[in-house]
C-alpha cells in the first residue's frame, strides 16, 4: 500500500469544499473562513503544487440572498438560487485569492461534460490551460441548467471526476465530517474512527451514512462513491473537517482525517474515463468464472454473462455485476441491449447463428474494460485459505 505523505509532496490536489463550510444560513458567506482557505491554497502553490477547487455554495448563497424559506427547494427554485449564487461565489473566490496575487477561473460543468468523451477532453484541456498559467480553477456543477435526471447531484463525485480528469494525485473532501467511522458517531457512541483505508471493501461501503445538513446534498455515501472513482484511478483521497480557520494547514499539522490509499494498478486515460462514468447505461450480471477471468485481465465473453439489464447501444458504458451483487468492473459494451440478451450465456462461436452476422467474440473487450473492485484469482484465494488453515 502507498504510504501517506505531506500535502506539499503531492503534484496536483483537488479540494472539494462543502456548502456548510462556506455559507451560514443567517449571515451568508463566511468571508474570514474563505480568506484562510485561500491562504492555505497560496502556501501549497508556493511549493509548486497545482490546486483545483470544487466549490459548493452557489445554491446556499443564492437562497440566502433571495431569502428563500428553509427546507427542500423545487428544481426551478434551486436553479434560480444557483443563478444568483454563482455570481456571488465566483466573486468571493476571486477576491480572496487576489490577496496572494492568484487569479481564479470559474468552470461550470454538467454531467455530460465528463460522460461524453469529446466534451470530457475539451473540459480537461481548459482546466489544464488554467493550471499552466498559474490560475486556480474554481469548479462547480452548473445547477442552473442541470436537471434532476441528468446531474451529479453532489460535488463529492464531481470532485472525484475532476481529479481523474486532470490526473490529480490527491483529492481532499472538506465538510463538517472529520473522516470515516465504523458507524455514524452521532448515533453510535461506540463508533470507531478509521485513519487509513487501504481498500474500499463492501464492509467499508456499509459504514456510509446519509447527509446531515440541508445546506449539503452529499453525505458519507457520496464520499465513499467518490473514493472508489478516485482511488481506482490511482488518486489518494482524504476526508477531513473544514471547520477550522486554516483546514489544509490543520491537516498538514496532523489534524484528524481519513486517508484512502490509491490503487496500485495504473490505468490509461481512456480507462480512467470509463471507470469514472457516473451513469452506466446498463448492467451485465456475470458468473464466478467470468469474475475470475476478468480479474486475470481477460475479456468478458457472452458465456460468462447470466443477465442483462438496462437499455444501451453498442459502445455505451455498462457496469459488470458479480454473483454477490457487487459491481466489479465497467466497460464499453460490444453489442446493444437486445443483442446482448440474445447471446447471453452462449459460446462466442454461436453468435453468428443467433444474430445473423459475425460479431465480436467478446461482450466487452479487455481493452475497453477496467476493474472497479479488487478481485482475487482462485490461486490467491487458495493461498489465503491455506494461510488461515
UniProtKB/Swiss-Prot annotation:
Pfam families named among the record's database cross-references: AA_kinase (PF00696), PUA (PF01472)
Keyword Nucleotidyltransferase in annotation: no
Domain of life: Bacteria
Pathway linked to the protein: Amino-acid biosynthesis; L-proline biosynthesis; L-glutamate 5-semialdehyde from L-glutamate: step 1/2
CDD domains listed in its UniProt record: AAK_G5K_ProB, PUA_G5K
Coiled-coil portions: none
Keywords for the protein's UniProt record, in alphabetical order: Amino-acid biosynthesis, ATP-binding, Cytoplasm, Kinase, Nucleotide-binding, Proline biosynthesis, Transferase
Binding-site positions, substrate: 56, 143, 155
GO molecular function, one term: glutamate 5-kinase activity
Enzyme Commission code(s) on record: 2.7.2.11
Reported function: Catalyzes the transfer of a phosphate group to glutamate to form L-glutamate 5-phosphate.
Family according to the record: Belongs to the glutamate 5-kinase family.
Protein name (Swiss-Prot/TrEMBL): Glutamate 5-kinase
Organism: Rhizobium rhizogenes (strain K84 / ATCC BAA-868)
